[in-house]
């Protein structure tokens, strides 16, 4: 048959039944397919044959053109060779088993092997089979003796040729292969590749040749077949020794032995490929390749050669003893050392070389989808190793998507555009005859939204690469699949999310100094850098400049001022994620001058009391003291009189014949302020009764104005309030607690003690937040907190006492004369107090008549109280609240829109409207009607009460009661409004009717005592907002609302009223939205969001692997008024890979939800993955 077609298909082992093998037994089969199965390297395309090596010339062209190949002695006549067959050639089966027989194996070629047929006439070998003497078999080929083994038929004629079969020892037969005459050739069996025997025609001389059969080396060398050495040598065809030896081929005895190259394709096997025609050896006889020597032509020198007799049973029918032959092929090894038949090469174990080792191992890699994936490692071995790449246990091959490259010792896998299917465990296996080694790494392919995406299982890998239909070839796969491509000089960097690798700490600078905030970034470009303050992006301006580059971003403030104080955030983003860092900037300076004009009171013959306001801005550091300066009409120079800590001072030893002026400076650690405005010229010795009534606003008939030290208060948990104060009568009570009169034991000063009921940690935290805000509000128009104590279920705030009662109660008093002039004085003080609050970045959010207190019962001085609902706007961004009193609350609060400083201005407008008219602009018959009036902003001046009110007053009110908060006046504009700038001393004092005010106050009192006032929670009945609560603290939890409990009807009983709210039904905590699993890249930010329902408002605690989390710059917890709670983890690292739990607790129970954070680390791991199972 023509077996050339077999070159294009793979031989499948064990596919023919025994009957089929018998039918095909006489046929000659292409044995090159068998060689390919046992280690012959494959080419990338089976049809493509690698270029010939010099040592293995292609002889196919000779088969087509030259009929006969001349031998080295010049004779090209095969008949002459056959003529002497009777003298020298012995039958295969008659050879002696004593060891003189040289099997047809692959031996070293240092000496020129003898040809099979080109010898002297007396030594001409006989044909191996039953061949007619007239014909002579062709030689197997001729190769260079110094490099590769020579063919069986191309040797010098002077030496005795070796027959293919077993010949008698008298002639010292030569083996079929190229063997040195002095060395014992190996039998024709197949040996383990670890011995690195070389094929018949192309092996290195230094390697041990393989025998033609599977024969144990310690025994007598076996002939071409698998024959036991102790018995009569078997022929090439696995024949029992007792029988007549069979010829090498399965040709009939009557037929003539035909050479390999000169026979017709149907009868003769095709020649070996990749061999030069001049050196092509001829097969001796029509022997079956499976049972005779196989030509090992296409094997690389470094790879295991294939024995001559290992044909696959699917193609080659086997004679008797097939099962035994299979066992021998699998188990037999080369000849044992020391045996007479062993070669010198076998006795040198060091010839095996060194096992592969990885000088540079594979490293774990992160790449972004669509970017280049490159894995590299460096392998050293001798002989060179076979490289195999696998992904998740599947062998990789070169495709148009994947390039496998090997440049010397550098091996690489390159994928131009990585896809999710390319992630997984990559393994590189290096294998040679001396052993094998492997290295592995994990590759992750990230999608662009990986930092914020929720955790999901990796999608199944789609089969992007074409699957090969060819079975793997063990040991030689890389030769067929690896393209050799020079590795790039510098491997591309793996894609990385942005990193802020350098960032300044919190800074404190002096006013006027320049500030540079620089954040150094790293990561995959492009990286976008944005500076923000109060969650608003900072743009270049006259004083601020932002400069961005690939190295980072710099924010420069040329001359720092007060408005530049705050928290600055640098946000860096790229397509792989984002990261942010914060720095607090404090601009410190000497304080602003004390506000307003110092005022003299209690003027006597040689003394007076001087009072003044605190600084509107303390310069970033608390005011430590005040310096009082005096000027008299004689010296006419300013001198420092004294230094004190409070905002009042009793001036003594004044001379009656002089006039005096005073001014005050504020002092902090950074310096002394400019002087305040000068007081009016004051003379002594005047009659006290002639003192102007103007002094009424700063004096009290019974006692001096209490001197208040501005203190930064911390809650004292070690001592009790009774240790420092005597607790006297109760001044008032409410659901929040009670108010008592306190007398300080040390000084005898009178204070008000507000005793809060605080059973839970959240309630205590709410009160601490109020104290913290009051520490920032040191101003004469704001009530001061001077001390605080925490006891078991109570927190006590020691407050400056204001004994004049509520403003509106003071107005309707019978001895009080209400004019527009008094209204101006009150509104001016309210505006001054709120202006200071706003300058500190705080909104009051509960401005109403109950929270405006008169200092005494006779004057017009007032103070603002109750900062329990106050909020910081500095770092709150878009703040929304859901509390207030319906009559005074702004529309944006009801509509649950972002609030601002203008929210307080609306309340000021409502207070002013009521103050001048005694009417409420929005009060309805019920809360729903009131809230509807507020949201529609419907009001007017049509009532006759406004007939007596000036146009300036109406304009003032109109500019505050604007529905759009952007159009409302701010406090500074209010103080500059013509109405508040009027000269109250000289203006007309027209009395206003107090009847409407009395009716209004009666209604308000009925509402408070008759359980009629409700919080914004009633909006739910209007289908506008649901779940709105009453008073809440700055952390978003409501305080206890006031119930119908009536307050004491004492003069100061209205002094500390809570926001009135309707009781909500109590509900156990539950999560209307739970946190979900996250998967983020290291260095980015992670955010868990949930929404918590329940009343009383639950306390929230976050846990990381059952350990509670404390808020820090790394862990930030947000909990707003609507129950939305978030945990933000900035700059995520591997340690953050954990289970996170949010726990909500109130008095009715608790609820939890849990999620997992998976962090894809960017660090390059050196550890190798687990070993894969051995490939079959």
Swiss-Prot record:
Statement: the UniProt record of this protein carries the keyword Disulfide bond: yes
Annotated EC: 2.7.11.18
Positions of modified residues (Phosphotyrosine): 710, 836, 896
Chain segments carrying region Calmodulin-binding: 26-41, 972-1035
GO CC, alphabetical: cleavage furrow; cytoplasm; lamellipodium; stress fiber
Domain Protein kinase: 725-980
Record-listed Phosphothreonine modification sites: 1039
Record keyword Cell division present: no
Pfam families assigned to the protein according to its UniProt record, in alphabetical order: fn3 (PF00041), I-set (PF07679), Pkinase (PF00069)
Top EC class, one word: transferase
CDD domains (UniProt xref): FN3, IgI_8_hMLCK_like, IgI_telokin-like, STKc_MLCK1
InterPro entries: FN3_dom, FN3_sf, Ig-like_dom, Ig-like_dom_sf, Ig-like_fold, Ig_I-set, Ig_sub, Ig_sub2
Catalyzed reaction equations: L-seryl-[myosin light chain] + ATP = O-phospho-L-seryl-[myosin light chain] + ADP + H(+); L-threonyl-[myosin light chain] + ATP = O-phospho-L-threonyl-[myosin light chain] + ADP + H(+)
Record PTM text: The C-terminus is deglutamylated by AGTPBP1/CCP1, AGBL1/CCP4 and AGBL4/CCP6, leading to the formation of Myosin light chain kinase, smooth muscle, deglutamylated form. The consequences of C-terminal deglutamylation are unknown. Can probably be down-regulated by phosphorylation. Tyrosine phosphorylation by ABL1 increases kinase activity, reverses MLCK-mediated inhibition of Arp2/3-mediated actin polymerization, and enhances CTTN-binding. Phosphorylation by SRC promotes CTTN binding.
Co-factor(s): Mg(2+); Ca(2+)
Residue numbers spanned by region Actin-binding (calcium/calmodulin-sensitive): 1-41
Ranges of biased composition (kind: Acidic residues): 688-706
GO biological process, one term: tonic smooth muscle contraction
Chain intervals for the UniProt region annotation (Disordered): 1-354, 448-497, 673-707
Pro residues bias locations: 43-55
Broad class of where this protein is predominantly found: cytoplasm
Record note on quaternary structure: All isoforms including Telokin bind calmodulin. Interacts with SVIL. Interacts with CTTN; this interaction is reduced during thrombin-induced endothelial cell (EC) contraction but is promoted by the barrier-protective agonist sphingosine 1-phosphate (S1P) within lamellipodia. A complex made of ABL1, CTTN and MYLK regulates cortical actin-based cytoskeletal rearrangement critical to sphingosine 1-phosphate (S1P)-mediated endothelial cell (EC) barrier enhancement. Binds to NAA10/ARD1 and PTK2B/PYK2.
Function: Calcium/calmodulin-dependent myosin light chain kinase implicated in smooth muscle contraction via phosphorylation of myosin light chains (MLC). Also regulates actin-myosin interaction through a non-kinase activity. Phosphorylates PTK2B/PYK2 and myosin light-chains. Involved in the inflammatory response (e.g. apoptosis, vascular permeability, leukocyte diapedesis), cell motility and morphology, airway hyperreactivity and other activities relevant to asthma. Required for tonic airway smooth muscle contraction that is necessary for physiological and asthmatic airway resistance.
Record-stated family: Belongs to the protein kinase superfamily. CAMK Ser/Thr protein kinase family.
Annotated protein name in UniProt: Myosin light chain kinase, smooth muscle
């Amino acid at each position: 048959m023509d077996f050339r077609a077999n070159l294009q298909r793979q031989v499948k082992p064990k596919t023919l039944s025994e009957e089929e093998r018998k039918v095909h037994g006489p046929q000659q089969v292409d044995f090159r397919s068998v060689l390919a199965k046992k280690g012959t390297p494959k080419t990338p395309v089976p049809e493509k044959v690698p270029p010939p090596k010099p040592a293995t010339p292609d002889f196919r062209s000779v088969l087509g053109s030259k009929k006969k190949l001349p031998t080295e002695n010049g004779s090209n006549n095969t008949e002459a060779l056959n003529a002497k067959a009777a003298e020298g050639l012995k039958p295969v089966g008659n050879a002696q088993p004593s060891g003189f027989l040289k099997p047809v194996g692959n031996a070293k070629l240092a000496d020129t092997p003898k040809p099979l047929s080109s010898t002297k006439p007396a030594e001409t070998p006989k044909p191996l089979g039953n061949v007619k003497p007239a014909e002579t078999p062709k030689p197997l080929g001729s190769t260079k003796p110094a490099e590769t083994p020579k063919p069986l038929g191309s040797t010098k004629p002077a030496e005795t040729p070796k027959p293919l079969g077993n010949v008698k020892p008298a002639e010292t037969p030569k083996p079929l292969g190229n063997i040195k005459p002095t060395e014992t050739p190996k039998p024709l069996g197949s040996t383990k590749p670890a011995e690195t025997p070389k094929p018949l025609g192309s092996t290195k001389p230094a390697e041990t040749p393989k025998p033609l059969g599977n024969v144990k080396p310690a025994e007598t060398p076996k002939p071409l077949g698998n024959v036991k050495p102790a018995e009569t040598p078997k022929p090439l065809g696995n024949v029992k020794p007792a029988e007549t030896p069979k010829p090498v081929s399965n040709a009939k005895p009557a037929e003539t032995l035909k050479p390999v190259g000169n026979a017709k394709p149907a009868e003769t096997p095709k020649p070996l490929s990749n061999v030069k025609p001049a050196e092509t050896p001829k097969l001796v006889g029509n022997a079956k390749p499976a049972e005779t020597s196989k030509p090992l032509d296409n094997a690389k020198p470094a790879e295991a050669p294939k024995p001559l007799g290992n044909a696959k049973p699917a193609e080659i029918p086997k004679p008797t003893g097939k099962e035994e032959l299979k066992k021998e092929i699998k188990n037999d090894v080369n000849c044992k050392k020391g045996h007479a038949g062993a070669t010198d090469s076998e006795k040198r174990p060091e010839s095996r070389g060194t096992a592969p080792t990885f000088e540079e191992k594979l490293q774990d890699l992160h790449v972004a989808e669509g970017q280049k994936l490159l894995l590299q490692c460096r392998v050293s071995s001798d002989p060179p190793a076979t490289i195999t790449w696998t992904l998740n246990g599947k062998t990789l091959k070169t495709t148009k998507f994947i390039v496998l490259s090997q440049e010397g010792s550098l091996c690489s896998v390159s994928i131009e555009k990585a896809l999710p299917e390319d992630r997984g465990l990559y393994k590189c296996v290096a294998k040679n005859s001396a052993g094998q080694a492997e290295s592995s790494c994990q590759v992750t392919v990230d999608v662009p939204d990986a930092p914020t995406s929720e955790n999901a299982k990796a999608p199944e890998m789609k089969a992007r690469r074409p699957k090969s239909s060819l079975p793997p070839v063990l040991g030689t796969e890389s030769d067929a699949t690896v393209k050799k491509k020079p590795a790039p000089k510098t491997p591309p960097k793996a894609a990385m999310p942005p990193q802020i690798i350098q960032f300044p700490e919190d800074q404190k600078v002096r006013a006027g100094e320049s500030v540079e905030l620089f954040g150094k970034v790293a990561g995959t470009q492009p990286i976008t850098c944005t500076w923000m303050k109060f969650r608003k992006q900072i743009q270049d301006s006259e004083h601020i400049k932002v400069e961005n580059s690939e190295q980072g971003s710099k924010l420069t403030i040329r001359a720092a001022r007060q408005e530049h104080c705050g928290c600055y955030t640098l946000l860096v983003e790229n397509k792989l994620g984002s990261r942010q860092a914060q720095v607090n900037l404090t601009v410190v300076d000497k304080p602003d001058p004390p506000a307003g004009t110092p005022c003299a009171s209690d003027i006597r013959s040689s003394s007076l009391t001087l009072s003044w306001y605190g600084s509107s801005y303390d310069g970033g550091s608390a005011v430590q003291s005040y310096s009082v300066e005096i000027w008299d009409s004689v010296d006419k120079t300013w001198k420092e009189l004294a230094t004190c800590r409070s905002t009042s001072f009793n001036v003594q030893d004044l001379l009656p014949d002089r006039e005096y002026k005073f001014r005050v400076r504020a002092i902090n650690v950074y310096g002394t302020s400019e002087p305040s405005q000068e007081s009016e010229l004051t003379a002594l010795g005047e009659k006290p009764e002639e003192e102007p009534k103007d002094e009424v606003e700063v004096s009290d008939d019974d006692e001096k104005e209490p001197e208040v030290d501005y203190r930064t208060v911390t809650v004292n948990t070690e001592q009790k309030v009774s240790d420092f104060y005597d607790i006297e009568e109760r001044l008032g009570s409410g659901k929040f607690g009670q108010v008592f009169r306190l007398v300080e034991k040390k000084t005898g000063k009178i204070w008000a003690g507000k005793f809060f009921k605080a059973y839970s940690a959240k309630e205590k935290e709410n009160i601490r937040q109020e104290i913290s805000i009051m520490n920032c509000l040191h101003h004469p128009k704001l009530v001061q907190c001077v001390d605080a104590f925490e006891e078991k279920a109570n927190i006590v705030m020691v407050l400056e006492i204001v004994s004049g009662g509520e403003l509106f109660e003071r107005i309707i008093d019978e001895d009080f004369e209400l004019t527009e002039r008094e209204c101006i004085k009150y509104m001016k003080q309210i505006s001054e107090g709120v202006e200071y609050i706003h300058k500190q970045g705080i909104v009051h959010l509960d401005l109403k008549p109950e929270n405006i207190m008169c200092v005494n019962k006779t004057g017009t001085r007032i103070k603002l109280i109750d900062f329990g609902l106050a909020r910081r706007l500095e770092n709150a961004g878009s703040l929304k609240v859901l509390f207030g009193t319906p009559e005074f609350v702004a529309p944006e609060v009801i509509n649950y829109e972002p609030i601002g400083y203008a929210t307080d201005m609306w309340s000021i407008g409502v207070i002013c409207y009521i103050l001048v008219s005694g009417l409420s602009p929005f009060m309805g018959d019920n809360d729903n009607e009131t809230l509807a009036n507020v949201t529609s902003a419907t009001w007017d001046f049509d009532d006759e009460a406004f007939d007596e009110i000036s146009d300036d007053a109406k304009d003032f009110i109109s500019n505050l009661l604007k529905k759009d908060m952007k159009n409302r006046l701010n406090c500074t504009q209010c103080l500059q409004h013509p109405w508040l700038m009027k000269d109250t001393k000289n203006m007309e004092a027209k009395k206003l009717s107090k009847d409407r005010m009395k009716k209004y106050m009666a209604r308000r009192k009925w509402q408070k005592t008759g359980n009629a006032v409700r919080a914004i929670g009633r909006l739910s009945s209007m289908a506008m907002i649901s779940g709105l609560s009453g008073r809440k603290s700055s952390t978003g939890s409501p305080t206890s609302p006031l119930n119908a409990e009536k307050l004491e009807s004492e003069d100061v009983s209205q002094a500390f009223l809570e926001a009135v709210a309707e009781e909500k039904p109590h509900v156990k905590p539950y999560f209307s939205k739970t946190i979900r699993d996250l998967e983020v890249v290291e260095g980015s930010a992670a955010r868990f969001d949930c929404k918590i329902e329940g009343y009383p408002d639950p306390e929230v605690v976050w846990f990381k692997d059952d350990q509670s989390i404390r808020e820090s710059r790394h862990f930030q917890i947000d909990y707003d008024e609507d129950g939305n709670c978030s945990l933000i983890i900035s700059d995520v690292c591997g340690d953050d890979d954990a289970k996170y739990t949010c726990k909500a607790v109130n008095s009715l129970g608790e609820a939890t939800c849990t999620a997992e954070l998976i962090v894809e680390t960017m660090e390059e791991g050196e550890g190798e993955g687990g070993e894969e199972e051995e490939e079959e």
